[in-house]
């Protein structure tokens, strides 16, 4: 099971848009996740957003680079940025994404 959380223990049901970039030599990469109207921003949610947690059977990948975008004075979008600083981190992220994509009907397309 592969899930994304913003507060530990609370799964985010909204499936994000994800943009990936990677350095030409493959040594570093970045993933930017964009969640429109996520459950974590719902009025009834009282959980504090402490980061973005990507959790699967291998463990947890964490980033604290999480921002909210506001429209008409209300939070509407959560954008999270995960920086991978080695090929091992990139490979681990891609294994998570393969599991998450399979469970949520996502597909990978190269730009």
From Swiss-Prot:
One matching Pfam family: Psb28
Matches recorded under InterPro entries: Psb28_c1_sf, PSII_Psb28_class-1
Signal peptide coordinates: none
Transmembrane segments: none
Assigned GO CC terms: photosystem II oxygen evolving complex; plasma membrane-derived thylakoid membrane
Compartments, as annotated in UniProt: Cellular thylakoid membrane
UniProt keyword Membrane present: yes
Membrane topology classification: Peripheral membrane protein
Keyword ATP-binding part of the UniProt annotation: no
Keywords assigned by UniProt, alphabetized: Membrane, Photosynthesis, Photosystem II, Thylakoid
Gene Ontology biological process terms in this record: photosynthesis
NCBIfam families on file: PS_II_psb28 (TIGR03047)
Cited PANTHER family: PHOTOSYSTEM II REACTION CENTER PSB28 PROTEIN, CHLOROPLASTIC (PTHR34963:SF2), PTHR34963
Family: Belongs to the Psb28 family.
Subunit structure: Part of the photosystem II complex.
Protein name: Photosystem II reaction center Psb28 protein
Gene this chain is encoded by: psb28
């Amino acid at each position: 099971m592969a899930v994304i959380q913003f507060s530990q223990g609370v799964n985010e049901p909204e499936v994000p848009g994800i943009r990936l970039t990677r350095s030409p030599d493959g040594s570093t990469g970045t993933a930017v996740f964009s969640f429109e109207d996520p459950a974590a921003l719902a009025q009834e949610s009282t959980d504090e957003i402490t980061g973005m947690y990507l959790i699967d059977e291998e463990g947890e990948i964490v980033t604290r680079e999480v921002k909210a975008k506001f429209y008409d004075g209300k939070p509407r979008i959560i954008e999270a940025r995960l920086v991978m600083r080695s090929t091992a981190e990139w490979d681990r992220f891609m294994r998570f994404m393969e599991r998450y994509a399979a469970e949520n009907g996502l597909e990978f397309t190269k730009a």
